[in-house]
């Protein structure tokens, strides 16, 4: 069910599926086998094999990383690495020679570095780097990091395994598989990715919390850890499993060098400021370049010596039956054949004269150690055995075989005490062609590079540990320089989860040293002689150490640890891919939601805009129709009134005619002599009266017409105003509805967005829990394998002890019986029968003693097995507890994030509602203002209405004049 939910979370719709993309630096149309010829295999990384390839045209060598990619999404995981390599042209960064995607395989061709990785060099030489060598590496790494950080690139996987060496003594920073390329200068990342032992504290916190992202300062921390690794072969906390080391990094103080006294003050101060747990106060690469530890480095001679030593011709001798006092390391210098001589005392160590190198590089020599026991300055010899320094000048006899190495008590796997390393600084090579002992079996290694293990992946240095043994104070050298130089010799022990020391080792409580108990050494001694030339000086370095079964166990444990780290890195890569896919899906969901919100709002606005347009259009049409109707009514009314007035006027004319007839009739009734005069007078009076009446009548008709027209116009204007008011009211209601709908949509969108973000947060934490559970399952699987290995080793050791005990008892019994018989014979006490009886009693006692020894061994084995079972159960329970704490922390953080998200949403909703009130108020004020403006406009229109008083207005209705009445 959980897996189904996980698939649902990462599922994209059909139209969201990614199509094949063309990448700028990846060629799809060319078979890389047509351009490059595979000449060998360099190693096997976590994501693919690494081959040594040769360009068929130019003959240039390259390291070819071949990765099978099943989909475009997997291909995209490696594009960032290719783009970074293609855009970063720097002398200390590995160069990209080409990238091809052909037949389902991605070929990444990068610069071939014959020197190999620094961790592989340390494995080859069985020692860490000297301080001058570390200075040069640190200087070049800082310059590379300063360049990367300037391009907004975070490497995120700095370690010695990712620092490659060229034959010229320069480094090449490699493996950008988990690097991040930011788009902004201040951008931060929250991906939990990298190798645990080198992770910065802020990166570790991102496993369960994404609230505190990190920036390029994480590389500075990894740089400091890498310097400690180069000094001590292994990074800090290497004895812990990855689960524990993450907890250690997050909660412990910054790591330091195991033996600070053997390193310079500048080196210790550099590590102190680089390993600052607070990334805000941690310096940048540019600031660290000004530090005295690296600021005066001008030569890479130390690295040229290192590469020459690692690439030197090796002669191997295997000798049997060597005793501790016979083991030696000889470091001899031979002057070149030219006229150039050099004192042998100046060329006595693998560093080839560190004092001269420091002078050449303008770097001050670290303060020399006072003449003190070697235990203070040779704190890192072989983890497989004690280290002795012998030299005629030191006055130490080669027969001093009783030196024991005190071992600091800590939880680690049983240390192999069978290896011995000695440095012999007594002579120059008398003959370059001197052959070793003919009795020894010889094997010569070709002068070829180790597998370029970290051209793409860490193939060698991910699972090495530092011995951390010290010599007792009884050995005091005469020269502090030699004591300081020999401190860099070290071998490796396998990294382990932590268990008790081997039962075959006994602890000397007085000296704190370990010694073998109950058995003798019957191991072979491997003697290696390296010859190389640097700057005209031929150097020979001979190292000897005893080969034991623990060597094979160490190699096996290194391999298993590498496998575990590869498995974790594969999980990290898959987690990163899943997180990237989920982030892309979430971004797409938010983008689609915002587009949908915008479309919904635009659709709602458009709907109301259309409604308003329709309303305004209807209003306009209605007003126009009202105007037209008014015009028609006005004409009709005017016509009707004119007709009525015409009839009234005709009647009025008839009345005037009648009056005229009456006047004539009255005049005719007068005497004839008075008629003429009276007629003339009466007619004049009648004419004046007629004109006056006619004028008054016409004026009254005109006034009546104007009143009727004005009344009609007023009624029409009132109707239009009512219509305008009604339309404005409807428009304002639409505006209110529009704003209310938009406000409702805004609130709904706030709620919907909150629900989506909340669901996305749940999906993100579900994915984190899913990835965390997968990681925990892998860790439990690794722990079970480890416990099983420990149980099997214990069973094998017990079987060997059980099989060896009868032989020892028989031999011991014979010896004791012989000694007892001899004592009886010497004493001569008693007769032969008495002696036989005593011998019989002694034999019975021996049988009882041997039986008791067998019972004691059986009890011891049972106790060991019980303790081992308890230890395995304790390991599992402790791991389970740590995993439960992480899961609980993740769930608690999810709860806090969800609660904070809800609170933020409620606060946003409250702020939105608080802002809504003034928006409503502003809307109502705006609508009321428009109403007032409309009323004011109507009022002004009425006041500005013209009042026609001239007869010209009536002439529209009365085309005749008053003179037409006669």
UniProtKB/Swiss-Prot annotation:
The active site is at residue 157. Inhibited by the pyrrole-indolinone inhibitor SU11274 (K00593): intercalates between the ATP-binding Lys-65 and alpha-C glutamate (Glu-81), resulting in a partial disordering of the lysine side chain. Also specifically inhibited by erlotinib. Slightly inhibited by gefitinib. It is found in: Cell membrane. Expressed predominantly in lymphoid organs such as spleen, thymus, and bone marrow. Residues 341-363, 371-392, 438-456, 485-497, 950-966 have a biased composition (Polar residues). ATP binds at residues 42-50, 65. Residues 588-936 form a coiled coil. Residues 36-294 form the Protein kinase domain. Its EC number is 2.7.11.1. Keywords: ATP-binding, Cell cycle, Cell membrane, Coiled coil, Kinase, Membrane, Nucleotide-binding, Phosphoprotein, Serine/threonine-protein kinase, Transferase. This is Serine/threonine-protein kinase 10. It catalyses: L-seryl-[protein] + ATP = O-phospho-L-seryl-[protein] + ADP + H(+); L-threonyl-[protein] + ATP = O-phospho-L-threonyl-[protein] + ADP + H(+). It is an enzyme of class 2 (transferase). GO terms for biological process: lymphocyte aggregation; protein autophosphorylation; regulation of lymphocyte migration.
């Amino acid at each position: 069910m959980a897996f189904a939910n996980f698939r649902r979370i990462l599922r994209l719709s059909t139209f969201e599926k990614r199509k094949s993309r063309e990448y700028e630096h990846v060629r799809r149309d060319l078979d890389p086998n047509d351009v490059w010829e595979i000449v060998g295999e360099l190693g096997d990384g976590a994501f693919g094999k690494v081959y040594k390839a040769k360009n068929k045209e130019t003959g240039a060598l390259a390291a070819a990383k071949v990765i099978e990619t099943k989909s475009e999404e997997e291909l995209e995981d490696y594009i960032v690495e290719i783009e970074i390599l293609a855009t970063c042209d720097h002398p200390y960064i590995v160069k990209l020679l080409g990238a091809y995607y052909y037949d389902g395989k991605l070929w990444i061709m990068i610069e071939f570095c014959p020197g190999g990785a620094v961790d592989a060099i340390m494995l080859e030489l069985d020692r860490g780097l000297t301080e001058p060598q570390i200075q040069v590496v640190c200087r070049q790494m800082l310059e590379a990091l300063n360049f990367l950080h300037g391009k907004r690139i975070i490497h995120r996987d700095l370690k010695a395994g990712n620092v490659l060496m060229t034959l010229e003594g320069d480094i090449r920073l490699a493996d950008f598989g988990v690097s991040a390329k930011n788009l902004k200068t201040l951008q931060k990342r929250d991906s939990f990715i990298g190798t645990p032992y080198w992770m910065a504290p802020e990166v570790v916190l991102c496993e369960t919390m994404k609230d505190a992202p990190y920036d390029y300062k994480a590389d500075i921390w990894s740089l400091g850890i890498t310097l400690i690794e180069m000094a001590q072969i292994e990074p800090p906390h290497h004895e812990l499993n990855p689960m524990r080391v993450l907890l250690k990094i997050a909660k412990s103080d910054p790591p330091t060098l195991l033996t600070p006294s053997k390193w310079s003050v500048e080196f210790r101060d550099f590590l102190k400021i680089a390993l600052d747990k607070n990334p805000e106060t941690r310096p940048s690469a540019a600031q660290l370049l000004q530090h005295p530890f690296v600021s005066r480095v001008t030569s890479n001679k130390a690295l040229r010596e290192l590469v020459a030593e690692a690439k030197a011709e090796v002669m191997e001798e295997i000798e049997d039956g060597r005793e501790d006092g016979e083991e030696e390391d000889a470091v001899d210098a031979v002057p070149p054949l030219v006229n150039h001589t050099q004192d042998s005392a100046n060329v006595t160590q693998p560093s080839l004269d560190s004092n001269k190198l420091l002078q050449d590089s303008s770097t001050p020599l670290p303060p020399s150690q006072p003449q003190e026991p070697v235990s203070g300055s040779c704190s890192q010899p072989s983890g497989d055995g004690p280290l002795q320094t012998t030299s005629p000048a030191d006055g130490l006899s080669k027969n001093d075989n009783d030196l024991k190495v005190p071992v600091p008590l800590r939880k680690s796997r049983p240390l192999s005490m069978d290896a011995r390393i000695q440095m012999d600084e007594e002579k120059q090579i008398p003959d370059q062609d001197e052959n070793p002992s003919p009795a020894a079996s010889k094997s010569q290694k070709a002068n070829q590079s180790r597998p370029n293990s970290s051209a793409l992946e860490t193939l060698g240095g991910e699972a090495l540990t530092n011995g951390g043994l010290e010599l007792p104070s009884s050995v005091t050298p005469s020269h502090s320089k030699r004591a300081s130089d020999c401190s860099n010799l070290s071998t490796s022990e396998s990294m382990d989860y932590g268990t008790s020391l081997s039962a075959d080792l006994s602890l000397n409580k007085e000296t704190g040293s370990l010694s073998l108990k109950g058995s003798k050494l019957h191991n072979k001694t491997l003697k290696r002689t390296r010859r190389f030339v640097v700057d005209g000086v031929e150097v020979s370095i001979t190292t000897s150490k005893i080969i034991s079964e623990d060597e094979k166990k160490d190699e096996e444990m290194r391999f298993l640890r590498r496998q575990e780290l590869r498995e974790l890195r594969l999980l990290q890569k898959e987690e990163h891919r899943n997180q990237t896919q989920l982030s892309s899906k979430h971004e797409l969901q938010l983008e689609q939601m915002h587009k949908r919100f915008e479309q919904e709002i635009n659709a709602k606005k458009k709907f109301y805009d259309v409604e308003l347009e329709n309303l305004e259009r209807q209003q306009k049409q209605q007003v126009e129709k009202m105007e037209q109707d008014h015009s028609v009514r006005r004409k009709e009314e005017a016509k009707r009134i004119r007709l009525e007035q015409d009839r009234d006027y005709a009647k009025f004319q008839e009345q005037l005619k009648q009056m005229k007839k009456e006047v004539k009739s009255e005049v005719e009734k007068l005497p004839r002599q008075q008629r003429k005069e009276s007629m003339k007078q009466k007619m004049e009076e009648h004419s004046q009266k007629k004109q006056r009446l006619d004028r008054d009548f016409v004026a009254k008709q005109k006034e009546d017409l104007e009143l009727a027209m004005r009344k009609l116009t007023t009624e029409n204007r009132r109707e239009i105003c009512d219509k305008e008011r009604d339309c404005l009211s409807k428009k304002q209601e639409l505006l209110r509805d529009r704003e209310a709908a938009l406000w409702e949509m805004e609130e709904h969108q706030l709620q919907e967005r909150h629900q989506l973000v909340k669901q996305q947060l749940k999906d993100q934490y579900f994915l984190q829990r899913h990835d965390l559970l997968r990681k925990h399952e892998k860790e439990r699987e690794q722990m079970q394998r480890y416990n099983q290995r420990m149980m099997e080793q214990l069973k094998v050791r017990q079987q060997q002890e059980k099989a060896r005990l009868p032989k020892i008892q028989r031999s011991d019994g014979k010896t004791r019986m012989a000694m007892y018989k001899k004592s009886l014979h010497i004493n001569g006490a008693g007769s032969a029968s008495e002696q036989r009886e005593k011998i019989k009693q002694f034999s019975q006692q021996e049988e009882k003693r041997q039986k008791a020894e067998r019972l004691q061994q059986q009890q011891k084995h049972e106790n060991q097995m019980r303790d081992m079972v308890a230890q395995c159960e304790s390991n599992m329970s402790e791991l389970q507890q740590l995993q439960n704490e992480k899961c609980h922390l993740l769930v608690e953080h999810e709860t806090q994030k969800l609660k904070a998200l809800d609170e933020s949403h409620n606060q946003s909703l409250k702020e939105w509602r608080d802002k809504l009130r003034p928006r409503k108020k502003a809307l109502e004020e705006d609508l009321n203002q428009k109403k007032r403006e409309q009323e004011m406009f109507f009022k002004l229109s009425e006041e500005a209405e013209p009042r026609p008083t001239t007869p010209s207005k009536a002439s529209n209705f009365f085309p005749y004049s008053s003179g037409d009445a006669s």
